[in-house]
Design a protein with these regions (language model features):
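Alpha-helical transmembrane segments and their helix-start/interface "positive-inside/aromatic belt" motifs
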Residues: 1-19
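Membrane-interfacial helical/loop segments at transmembrane boundaries in membrane proteins
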Residues: 36-45
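Juxtamembrane loop-transmembrane helix junctions in multi-pass integral membrane proteins
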Residues: 2-6, 44-54, 58, 92, ...
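Alpha-helical transmembrane segments
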Residues: 10-15, 62-65, 100-104, 130-137
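Soluble C-terminal extramembrane regulatory/interaction domains of multi-pass membrane proteins
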Residues: 152-500
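Transmembrane alpha-helix detector for multi-pass membrane proteins
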Residues: 20-34, 48-119, 140-151
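Hydrophobic alpha-helical transmembrane segments and immediately flanking/interface helices
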Residues: 82-91, 122-142, 198-224
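Canonical alpha-helical transmembrane segment with a positive-inside/aromatic-interface signature
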Residues: 91, 95, 117-188
């Protein structure tokens, strides 16, 4: 991994720098002393007690290194684990670099003491002493790079990358037949819980960058898995109650039949994060809905209907939660992502019609909760889907249009002007697309409205020339704005409305 490579590079450069400096220092001293021979450079055979004196500070140096490492790790790891995930401690201890460094320092410290004990009046274990000296130097050379490695290890971005790498590796090993599917499932369940915990805690602390990285990482996991799913063994798709605690027997049966436990597990983390984001981090909401939409679109493109169905079910859960919380901003974003998904369904009339039905259903649910503005905005998005279906000559175009015009434009406190305008925009767009038969259906739907009200709506739509809305929004485009060629069709549609 990148952190490990940085550690190795730092260690090599530090070792090289120390070697060059110490060698140059020795060469200068040796030259200044008149090039003394080997017998004058060593205490061996002359005064072995000096060798013990030499190794005593080395033992203390090792103790200092170990003390610094243990103090740093003992403080930093638990504190960071408390912020992100308790499993961080286990991750740290399982990391190969940490195991090697801590083990090498402990063995090196013990070896210095062992070498010092071996020294006797007539015996000098020179290879053991040399190993102790060079081991001490290498330990100090590794100290600073390893400190940086530990700090990077605790970076939540790196933690998320490690978790994602573990999941991808487990999938790859199962695909190649080198890991039992049940064992891989256990690994993945644990890694998913850890990732979800980091994302949720980041949202709670308003740590937006980490939350967004976690969401993005989950999306990448699903993308990678989607490319491998067809190659996974049959045993991979079998799960039991232990894997989904709380699920009914019927639910488990559906999961096994649809072979979508992995998507369900990952996207459950999306949903839990979404629930937290509704109250604390509004900028995480578009990231979650966009990731879900991308997952659904990719599933459609590779012909994985089961994965598509799971993604859309979670979309509906998001909509339900937003309606319950009466969060218009979240609904505004979800409706946009939902309509964008329709672009990948134009050659799938049944799925496109189902999307239109759900659009209408949740728009009406929003109205029932008093969110009439959300329902009217849904009219624009559902109308956009109807126009795209008509342009693609989709067999479902009339069905999607019927869902759009079925939205009630007559409210308890009077006509809903925004929805009326949305229907007029759709009617004009259908004329532009040479679908006068469908435009007539829209006109018939608006026939219960007074002519002066319809004329006012047409006039206001004609007057909109600025494409961008006058406030900063996620979409930025004014929903009432119409392209010139589209606006030119307002007059013919007004004729269908009987406005002359």
């Amino acid at each position: 991994m990148e952190s490990r490579q940085r550690f190795l590079r730092g260690f090599l450069w530090m070792s090289l720098g120390m070697a060059l400096f110490f060698t140059a220092e020795f060469a200068l001293e040796w030259h200044g002393a008149g090039h003394p021979g080997a017998e004058l450079l060593s205490w061996t055979g002359n005064n072995n007690a000096k060798l013990v004196d030499l190794m005593s500070p080395m033992a203390r140096a090792y103790n200092n290194v170990l003390a610094m490492l243990i103090a740093t790790i003992g403080l930093a790891i638990p504190l960071t684990a408390n912020m992100h995930t308790p499993k961080l401690i286990d991750m740290f201890l399982r990391d190969r670099t940490n195991q090697i460094m801590l083990g090498a320092c402990a063995i090196g410290a013990a070896h210095v003491l062992w070498s010092a004990w071996l020294v006797g009046p007539g015996f000098a274990p020179m290879w053991a002493i040399r190993l102790s000296v060079f081991g001490t130097l290498l330990g100090w050379a590794a100290l600073i790079p390893y400190f940086f490695y530990v700090v990077r290890f605790l970076d939540p971005s790196n933690i998320l990358r490690r978790l994602r790498a573990d999941v991808v590796e487990a999938i790859d090993l199962v695909q190649r037949g080198k890991l039992d599917p049940e064992e891989a499932q256990n690994i993945i369940h644990e890694r998913m819980h850890q990732t979800g915990t980091i994302v949720i805690k980041s949202i709670d602390r308003a740590d937006r960058s980490v939350a967004l990285e976690g969401i993005w990482g989950l999306k990448l996991i699903l993308q990678d898995y989607g490319e491998r799913k067809a190659l996974m063994p049959a045993a991979w798709f079998k799960v039991d109650r232990r894997d989904f605690v709380g699920a009914s027997q019927e639910a488990l049966q559906v999961i096994n039949e649809e072979r979508n436990w992995f998507e369900l597990r990952v996207m459950t983390q999306f949903f839990l994060a979404y629930q937290g984001a509704l109250a604390r981090s509004t900028d995480a909401i578009p990231a979650i809905s966009d990731a879900t939409r991308v997952v659904a679109a990719l599933a459609v493109r590779r012909g994985d209907r089961e994965a598509y169905v799971v993604a859309t079910r979670f979309f509906h859960n998001y909509l339900r939660e937003a309606i319950k919380r009466k969060d218009v901003h979240a609904l505004f974003d979800l409706f946009y992502q939902y309509r964008t998904l329709a672009s990948d369904l134009l050659d799938r009339p049944e799925e496109l019609h189902a999307l239109g039905q759900r659009f209408r259903y949740y728009a009406e649910q929003a109205t029932a909760q008093g969110l009439t503005f959300a329902q009217q905005m849904a009219g624009y998005d559902l109308g956009w889907v109807a126009l795209e279906a008509a342009a693609a000559a989709s067999p479902s175009a009339p069905l999607v249009l019927s869902e759009m015009i079925a939205l009630n434009h007559n409210g308890t406190h009077g006509p809903r002007m925004l929805l009326i305008k949305a229907k007029i925009v759709v009617g004009a767009g259908l004329i532009e697309r040479k679908r006068g038969d469908l435009a007539q259906l829209v006109a018939d739907n608006l026939a219960d409205l007074p002519a002066d009200l319809l004329a006012q709506a047409v006039a206001e739509l004609s007057a909109v020339r600025e494409r961008a809305f006058w406030e900063v929004t996620d979409r930025q485009v004014n929903v009432e704005w119409m392209a010139p060629e589209h606006r030119a069709c307002l007059a013919p549609f007004a004729g269908l409305l009987g406005l002359g």
